[in-house]
UniProtKB/Swiss-Prot annotation:
This is Insulin. Disulfide bonds join 7-38, 19-51, 37-42. Keywords: Carbohydrate metabolism, Disulfide bond, Glucose metabolism, Hormone, Secreted. GO terms for cellular component: extracellular space. Gene3D superfamilies: Insulin-like. It comes from Atractosteus spatula (Alligator gar). InterPro entries: Insulin (IPR004825), Insulin-like (IPR016179), Insulin-like_sf (IPR036438), Insulin_CS (IPR022353), Insulin_family (IPR022352). Its main location: secreted. It is found in: Secreted.
Length: 52
C-alpha cells in the first residue's frame, strides 16, 4: 500500500478500516499518530500499531 497523509477525520476513517472490530486508540492530543500519519505519510502497518 502507498504511504498516505491522513489528518483529522480521514485518519479516523482509515483507522476504522484497518482495525475493524478490534477498535483503536485515537487521542489527537497525543503526538504519535498525527506526527506519523498527518505531518508525514504513513503506511497501513503503522496504522495497525494503533489498533487495540
Amino acid at each position: 500500500a502507498a504511504n498516505q497523509h491522513l489528518c483529522g477525520s480521514h485518519l479516523v476513517e482509515a483507522l476504522y478500516l484497518v482495525c475493524g472490530e478490534k477498535g483503536f486508540f485515537y487521542n489527537p492530543n497525543k503526538v504519535g499518530i498525527v506526527e506519523q500519519c498527518c505531518h508525514k505519510p504513513c503506511t497501513i502497518y503503522e496504522l495497525e500499531n494503533y489498533c487495540n
